[in-house]
Protein backbone atom coordinates (compact mmCIF):
# COMPACT_ATOMS: atom_id res chain seq x y z
CA UNK A 1 0.00 0.00 0.00
CA UNK A 2 1.19 3.53 -0.81
CA UNK A 3 0.97 6.49 1.54
CA UNK A 4 0.32 10.00 0.24
CA UNK A 5 1.66 12.73 2.52
CA UNK A 6 0.80 16.41 2.04
CA UNK A 7 4.00 18.42 2.32
CA UNK A 8 3.36 21.62 0.37
CA UNK A 9 1.91 24.03 2.92
CA UNK A 10 3.41 27.34 4.05
CA UNK A 11 2.99 26.73 7.79
CA UNK A 12 2.21 30.38 8.51
CA UNK A 13 1.57 29.81 12.23
CA UNK A 14 5.15 28.54 12.52
CA UNK A 15 6.51 31.36 10.37
CA UNK A 16 9.81 31.72 12.23
CA UNK A 17 10.54 28.08 11.44
CA UNK A 18 9.05 27.96 7.95
CA UNK A 19 10.55 31.10 6.44
CA UNK A 20 13.07 28.89 4.63
CA UNK A 21 11.49 25.44 4.77
CA UNK A 22 8.09 23.72 4.35
CA UNK A 23 6.18 22.91 7.53
CA UNK A 24 6.78 19.12 7.39
CA UNK A 25 10.53 19.82 7.56
CA UNK A 26 10.27 21.58 10.92
CA UNK A 27 12.15 19.33 13.32
CA UNK A 28 11.26 17.50 16.51
CA UNK A 29 14.24 15.94 18.24
CA UNK A 30 16.45 17.02 15.37
CA UNK A 31 14.40 15.13 12.76
CA UNK A 32 11.78 16.56 10.37
CA UNK A 33 8.14 15.89 11.15
CA UNK A 34 7.98 14.22 7.75
CA UNK A 35 10.59 11.69 8.90
CA UNK A 36 8.59 10.94 12.08
CA UNK A 37 5.43 10.31 10.04
CA UNK A 38 7.26 8.06 7.59
CA UNK A 39 8.78 6.10 10.48
CA UNK A 40 5.30 5.61 11.97
CA UNK A 41 4.02 4.29 8.65
CA UNK A 42 7.12 2.15 8.13
CA UNK A 43 6.55 0.54 11.54
CA UNK A 44 3.05 -0.28 10.31
CA UNK A 45 4.34 -1.93 7.15
CA UNK A 46 3.95 0.94 4.64
CA UNK A 47 7.19 1.68 2.80
CA UNK A 48 6.16 3.38 -0.44
CA UNK A 49 5.44 7.09 -0.22
CA UNK A 50 4.10 9.77 -2.54
CA UNK A 51 5.06 13.18 -1.16
CA UNK A 52 2.95 16.12 -2.42
CA UNK A 53 5.40 18.99 -2.78
CA UNK A 54 4.60 22.69 -2.95
CA UNK A 55 6.28 25.51 -1.02
CA UNK A 56 10.04 24.87 -0.88
CA UNK A 57 9.68 21.45 -2.45
CA UNK A 58 13.36 21.70 -3.34
CA UNK A 59 14.17 21.57 0.38
CA UNK A 60 12.47 18.17 0.71
CA UNK A 61 14.12 16.85 -2.45
CA UNK A 62 17.54 17.85 -1.17
CA UNK A 63 16.86 16.23 2.21
CA UNK A 64 16.23 12.86 0.61
CA UNK A 65 19.10 13.23 -1.86
CA UNK A 66 21.37 13.80 1.15
CA UNK A 67 19.52 11.34 3.40
CA UNK A 68 22.44 8.98 4.05
CA UNK A 69 24.84 11.83 4.81
CA UNK A 70 22.36 13.58 7.12
CA UNK A 71 21.33 10.48 9.07
CA UNK A 72 24.64 8.64 9.41
CA UNK A 73 28.18 9.28 10.60
CA UNK A 74 30.66 9.76 7.76
CA UNK A 75 34.36 9.48 7.04
CA UNK A 76 35.47 11.61 4.09
CA UNK A 77 38.86 11.27 2.42
CA UNK A 78 39.34 14.68 0.82
CA UNK A 79 42.39 13.56 -1.13
CA UNK A 80 40.54 10.78 -2.93
CA UNK A 81 36.92 11.87 -2.63
CA UNK A 82 36.07 8.56 -0.98
CA UNK A 83 33.20 8.63 1.51
CA UNK A 84 32.44 5.90 4.03
CA UNK A 85 28.98 5.80 5.58
CA UNK A 86 28.88 4.41 9.11
CA UNK A 87 25.81 3.04 10.95
CA UNK A 88 24.14 2.71 7.55
CA UNK A 89 20.59 3.82 8.30
CA UNK A 90 19.00 2.66 5.04
CA UNK A 91 15.24 2.33 5.43
CA UNK A 92 13.58 0.20 2.78
CA UNK A 93 11.58 3.12 1.37
CA UNK A 94 10.49 4.00 -2.13
CA UNK A 95 9.75 7.73 -2.30
CA UNK A 96 8.00 9.62 -5.11
CA UNK A 97 8.55 13.39 -4.77
CA UNK A 98 5.88 15.10 -6.87
CA UNK A 99 5.38 18.84 -7.43
CA UNK A 100 1.69 19.67 -6.88
CA UNK A 101 1.92 23.45 -7.24
CA UNK A 102 2.75 26.35 -4.97
CA UNK A 103 -0.76 27.55 -4.10
CA UNK A 104 -2.76 24.37 -4.70
CA UNK A 105 -5.19 23.51 -1.90
CA UNK A 106 -5.18 20.21 -0.01
CA UNK A 107 -7.80 18.57 -2.21
CA UNK A 108 -6.18 19.87 -5.36
CA UNK A 109 -2.85 18.37 -4.35
CA UNK A 110 -4.43 14.94 -3.98
CA UNK A 111 -6.22 15.38 -7.31
CA UNK A 112 -2.89 16.07 -9.02
CA UNK A 113 -1.53 12.81 -7.62
CA UNK A 114 -4.25 10.63 -9.11
CA UNK A 115 -2.00 8.76 -11.52
CA UNK A 116 0.30 7.82 -8.66
CA UNK A 117 -2.42 6.08 -6.64
CA UNK A 118 -4.92 4.79 -9.18
CA UNK A 119 -3.65 1.22 -8.79
CA UNK A 120 -5.35 0.57 -5.44
CA UNK A 121 -6.36 1.53 -1.94
CA UNK A 122 -3.99 4.05 -0.35
CA UNK A 123 -3.34 5.98 2.84
CA UNK A 124 -3.57 9.78 2.80
CA UNK A 125 -2.39 12.05 5.59
CA UNK A 126 -0.97 15.42 6.51
CA UNK A 127 2.69 16.26 7.01
CA UNK A 128 2.23 17.71 10.48
CA UNK A 129 0.49 15.07 12.60
CA UNK A 130 1.86 12.14 14.59
CA UNK A 131 -0.06 9.33 16.27
CA UNK A 132 0.29 5.77 17.51
CA UNK A 133 -2.61 4.64 15.34
CA UNK A 134 -2.75 0.95 14.39
CA UNK A 135 -2.69 1.18 10.59
CA UNK A 136 -3.34 -2.54 10.18
CA UNK A 137 -6.56 -2.28 12.20
CA UNK A 138 -7.49 0.88 10.29
CA UNK A 139 -7.09 -0.86 6.93
CA UNK A 140 -9.06 -3.87 8.14
CA UNK A 141 -11.88 -1.56 9.31
CA UNK A 142 -11.89 0.05 5.86
CA UNK A 143 -11.93 -3.31 4.10
CA UNK A 144 -14.89 -4.56 6.13
CA UNK A 145 -17.19 -1.58 5.58
CA UNK A 146 -16.53 -1.36 1.84
CA UNK A 147 -16.97 2.41 1.45
CA UNK A 148 -14.74 4.78 -0.51
CA UNK A 149 -13.16 6.54 2.45
CA UNK A 150 -12.21 6.10 6.09
CA UNK A 151 -11.00 8.92 8.31
CA UNK A 152 -9.15 8.34 11.55
CA UNK A 153 -11.01 10.23 14.25
CA UNK A 154 -9.29 11.39 17.42
CA UNK A 155 -10.18 13.22 20.61
CA UNK A 156 -8.67 16.71 20.64
CA UNK A 157 -6.86 17.99 23.70
CA UNK A 158 -8.76 20.63 25.61
CA UNK A 159 -7.38 24.17 25.52
CA UNK A 160 -8.02 24.42 29.24
CA UNK A 161 -7.66 22.24 32.30
CA UNK A 162 -10.90 21.02 33.84
CA UNK A 163 -12.03 20.80 37.42
CA UNK A 164 -14.07 18.24 39.31
CA UNK A 165 -16.26 19.97 41.89
CA UNK A 166 -18.37 18.81 44.77
CA UNK A 167 -20.16 22.00 45.75
CA UNK A 168 -17.44 24.62 46.11
CA UNK A 169 -14.79 21.98 46.85
CA UNK A 170 -12.33 21.19 44.05
CA UNK A 171 -11.81 17.42 44.21
CA UNK A 172 -9.62 17.04 41.12
CA UNK A 173 -7.79 19.17 38.57
CA UNK A 174 -6.87 17.82 35.14
CA UNK A 175 -4.52 19.82 32.95
CA UNK A 176 -4.58 19.28 29.17
CA UNK A 177 -7.28 16.65 29.28
CA UNK A 178 -9.04 15.45 26.14
CA UNK A 179 -12.57 16.36 25.13
CA UNK A 180 -14.16 12.97 25.68
CA UNK A 181 -17.38 13.66 23.76
CA UNK A 182 -15.77 15.22 20.69
CA UNK A 183 -14.12 13.44 17.76
CA UNK A 184 -12.20 15.33 15.07
CA UNK A 185 -10.35 14.59 11.84
CA UNK A 186 -6.95 13.16 12.76
CA UNK A 187 -5.76 12.54 9.21
CA UNK A 188 -4.59 9.02 8.36
CA UNK A 189 -7.34 8.45 5.79
CA UNK A 190 -7.71 5.20 3.88
CA UNK A 191 -9.09 5.94 0.41
CA UNK A 192 -10.16 4.21 -2.74
CA UNK A 193 -8.91 5.94 -5.91
CA UNK A 194 -12.47 6.87 -6.92
CA UNK A 195 -12.71 9.08 -3.81
CA UNK A 196 -10.64 11.54 -5.85
CA UNK A 197 -13.69 12.02 -8.12
CA UNK A 198 -15.11 14.21 -5.35
CA UNK A 199 -12.32 16.77 -5.88
CA UNK A 200 -13.32 19.31 -8.52
CA UNK A 201 -10.26 21.54 -8.93
CA UNK A 202 -6.93 22.78 -7.57
CA UNK A 203 -8.87 25.17 -5.34
CA UNK A 204 -10.76 22.37 -3.57
CA UNK A 205 -10.00 22.06 0.12
CA UNK A 206 -10.09 18.36 0.94
CA UNK A 207 -11.79 18.84 4.31
CA UNK A 208 -14.70 20.79 2.78
CA UNK A 209 -16.42 19.89 -0.50
CA UNK A 210 -14.79 16.48 -1.10
CA UNK A 211 -15.12 15.12 2.44
CA UNK A 212 -18.57 16.65 2.86
CA UNK A 213 -19.64 15.04 -0.42
CA UNK A 214 -18.35 11.64 0.64
CA UNK A 215 -20.21 11.96 3.94
CA UNK A 216 -23.44 13.08 2.26
CA UNK A 217 -23.28 10.08 -0.09
CA UNK A 218 -22.71 7.65 2.78
CA UNK A 219 -19.18 6.89 1.54
CA UNK A 220 -17.20 8.11 4.57
CA UNK A 221 -16.65 6.06 7.72
CA UNK A 222 -14.81 7.03 10.90
CA UNK A 223 -12.24 4.83 12.62
CA UNK A 224 -11.99 5.81 16.28
CA UNK A 225 -8.43 6.06 17.54
CA UNK A 226 -8.44 6.46 21.33
CA UNK A 227 -4.66 6.64 21.63
CA UNK A 228 -2.12 9.42 21.21
CA UNK A 229 -2.45 12.02 18.46
CA UNK A 230 -1.05 15.50 18.01
CA UNK A 231 -0.65 17.96 15.19
CA UNK A 232 2.06 20.63 15.09
CA UNK A 233 0.27 23.84 14.16
CA UNK A 234 1.81 26.12 16.80
CA UNK A 235 5.04 26.64 18.72
CA UNK A 236 3.26 25.42 21.84
CA UNK A 237 2.52 22.09 20.14
CA UNK A 238 6.08 21.87 18.80
CA UNK A 239 7.43 22.46 22.32
CA UNK A 240 5.16 19.75 23.72
CA UNK A 241 6.33 17.26 21.08
CA UNK A 242 9.98 18.18 21.74
CA UNK A 243 9.47 17.55 25.45
CA UNK A 244 7.88 14.16 24.82
CA UNK A 245 10.69 13.17 22.47
CA UNK A 246 13.35 14.39 24.89
CA UNK A 247 11.80 12.38 27.72
CA UNK A 248 12.29 9.17 25.78
CA UNK A 249 8.57 8.45 26.06
CA UNK A 250 7.18 9.85 22.80
CA UNK A 251 3.98 7.80 22.27
CA UNK A 252 4.29 7.89 18.49
CA UNK A 253 7.78 6.33 18.54
CA UNK A 254 6.51 2.85 17.75
CA UNK A 255 9.48 1.80 15.64
CA UNK A 256 12.50 -0.08 16.91
CA UNK A 257 10.33 -3.12 17.50
CA UNK A 258 10.05 -6.16 15.26
CA UNK A 259 9.37 -5.04 11.67
CA UNK A 260 5.72 -5.09 10.71
CA UNK A 261 4.65 -7.04 7.63
CA UNK A 262 3.95 -4.97 4.56
CA UNK A 263 0.40 -3.58 4.61
CA UNK A 264 -1.26 -4.86 1.48
CA UNK A 265 -3.99 -3.21 -0.52
CA UNK A 266 -7.58 -4.08 0.25
CA UNK A 267 -8.56 -7.15 -1.71
CA UNK A 268 -5.03 -8.60 -1.98
Listing of model-derived features with the role each one plays in the protein:
Residues 43, 115, 213-216:
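Solvent-exposed polar/charged
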Residues 121-125, 130-143, 155-158, 169-267:
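Catalytic-core segments of class I nucleotidyltransferases/pyrophosphorylases
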Residues 30-31, 103-106, 204:
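A conditional alpha-helix N-cap/helix-loop micro-motif detector
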Residues 36, 108-112, 210:
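Well-ordered alpha-helical segments embedded in enzymatic catalytic cores
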Residues 3-5, 51, 124, 149-152, ...:
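Structural beta-sheet core signal
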Residues 60-167:
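Conserved beta-loop-beta/alpha segment of the NTase-like Rossmann-fold superfamily
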